[in-house]
Amino acid sequence: MDGEVKSYWFKTFSHKSFSVIWDLFYNTSNGVTKKTINSGTILNHLNEVGLAYWVMGDGSLHREGRVLTLHTQGFSHDENKMMSEELNLKFGFKSKVVKHKNKFVVQFTTSDANKLHDLIKPYLIPTMQYKLPRKL
């Protein structure tokens, strides 16, 4: 190469209509903004497509291929517990909160493999199919 550096960039924009989404995941108190999740967010807003996107972004499949973890370490234990409970209530899972490197994550058990597979498979892009739990 001749020392020329190629780069690409893009610009995003902000709009007041995104404030509704911001309010679901951030709380400002005493001038400090913290990531959070409000009760009912999963029950009222998450569907199968959203769950598939969540798995593609933050999911990891264990070696045996039947246990899936959502890496939710950015949330507190109580927030993880609430998310797990709402996922279980909304979709009929048996997920649980487990400790992972001194933080907490939501984990789907092997008993959820078939249901999780069937729910998200239609929405996973081909390069993310490796995150799909194997059916029992």
From Swiss-Prot:
Gene Ontology BP, a term: intron homing
GO molecular function, a single term: endonuclease activity
SUPFAM superfamilies listed in its UniProt record: Homing endonucleases
Keywords on record: Endonuclease, Hydrolase, Intron homing, Mitochondrion, Nuclease
Tree of life domain: Eukaryota
Pfam families linked: LAGLIDADG_2 (PF03161)
Location in the cell: Mitochondrion
Record GO cellular component, one term: mitochondrion
InterPro entries: Homing_endonucl, LAGLIDADG_dom
Main localization (coarse): mitochondrion
Coiled coil: none
EC number: 3.1.-.-
Biological function: Mitochondrial DNA endonuclease involved in intron homing.
Family that this chain belongs to: Belongs to the LAGLIDADG endonuclease family.
Miscellaneous section: Encoded within intron 3 (LRI3) of mitochondrial large subunit ribosomal RNA.
Record protein name field: Probable intron-encoded DNA endonuclease 3
